[in-house]
Amino acid sequence: MPVGRSLSLDPNLLAQLQSHSPTLWLNPHQGMPLPDFAPTAADLADADARLRRCAGLLAELFAELRPSGGLIASPLQPAEPLKRAARAGHAQAGAWYVKRDDALPVAGSIKARGGFHEVLALAESIAERHGLAGADTDRRALASGAARARFARHTVMVGSTGNLGLSIGMLASALGFRTVAHMSADAKAWKKARLRTRGVEVVEHAGDYAKAVDAGRRQAAGMPCCHFVDDEGSRMLFLGYATAAAELAAQLAQAGRPVDARHPLFVHLPCGVGGAPGGIVYGLKALYGEHVHAFVAEPTASPCVLVQLAGDAAHPRSVYDIGLDNRTEADGLAVAQASPLAAALLRAQAAGAFTVDDRQLFAHLLDARERLGIDLEPSAAAAFGGPAWIAGSDAGRAYLRGRGIDPDAATHVIWATGGSLVPAQEHRRFQAHARAQRQVGGAGA
């Protein structure tokens, strides 16, 4: 049986994916009922409240967070220069913005939202269990000597391609936890070095993301007082990402961009295992319902969420099942199999997915530098082609027509997910590579 035949994928879609051709896929399941395990409104409110009551603690632990009072928040940057540079005139509709999670302090990526939330939830739970904090206790008490001594008896463990490990490692070690990060072969050397300077134990693996996560999960299962941050199934991570929705809503209101039937919101999100985009989409759907249209962006070598959503929902599927190799410069998105939690929720809520090859990643990275003055890592540039896919492709235009959407009335938010902590020499290498490829032919849209 040919590779991929048993996955219930449309043959044309399968052929496009196997040829590494950048593709826009529209989700026919959008609008289906949410699964029974979907988070509740109370869950979302609890996560937001946790981050707010712990803001003072974060500001005390990290000087970089003092200007925001300890809140995890990033700017919303207008992207008109990027819009004007779009290749096709018909792709220049609507208002474009970039959500700058690449600039999030301390962790330098979108993973600060979910990672910090999970570590804070763990710290609160331990402190309350041992009488170190109550419901009304100032959370700065979690940085006390007594709290640190208690946390030092516990281990926090995570499996990561890089950015989640940074997020978990930075906060857990700052609170006094013993911290272990299992890192895949895709993880960049500078990320591992940064963790080690913070006292985090880094365990390097020759295999991919899934193998690093599995190794961490198995080690944690045999250890007392060990909390494993499971990127493939953590509700705490998911809810932390979901809190970004209210932040974005306030920024759009301040920018004078309504979100309603006449003024739809399109959000374009880089996607690895699916937790971060899944959480953000879930939060936005809770606020805006059908008026938000979310598209996830994945490497052509690693479209794990697209494969899961387009195939049989009953069984987990891997990009290896369709003959792809999961090898990409987008290290943060080099994931072969989607999170079951995120995939089930995205199946009901995502508008679709599109894929981007490495040449396009570097072209978008260079556009971000030259048009907007933003230095990104390759994975963070994955979603920059989203607006052009919607307004400039046959499938995208069909999506707009089918919903009676006026492209000029839409707001497009492109999520930039990481880059501010990348060493300067790495940024120079990225940009030199992008300029070299542009000289020999550039990249497609």
Curated annotation (Swiss-Prot):
Its cofactor is pyridoxal 5'-phosphate. GO terms for molecular function: D-serine ammonia-lyase activity; hydro-lyase activity; pyridoxal phosphate binding. SUPFAM superfamilies: Tryptophan synthase beta subunit-like PLP-dependent enzymes. Gene3D superfamilies: 3.40.50.1100. GO terms for biological process: D-serine catabolic process; isoleucine biosynthetic process. The modification N6-(pyridoxal phosphate)lysine is found at K111. Keywords: Lyase, Pyridoxal phosphate. InterPro entries: D_Ser_am_lyase, Ser/Thr_Dehydratase, TrpB-like_PALP, TrpB-like_PALP_sf. It catalyses: D-serine = pyruvate + NH4(+). Belongs to the serine/threonine dehydratase family. DsdA subfamily. This is Probable D-serine dehydratase. The gene is dsdA.
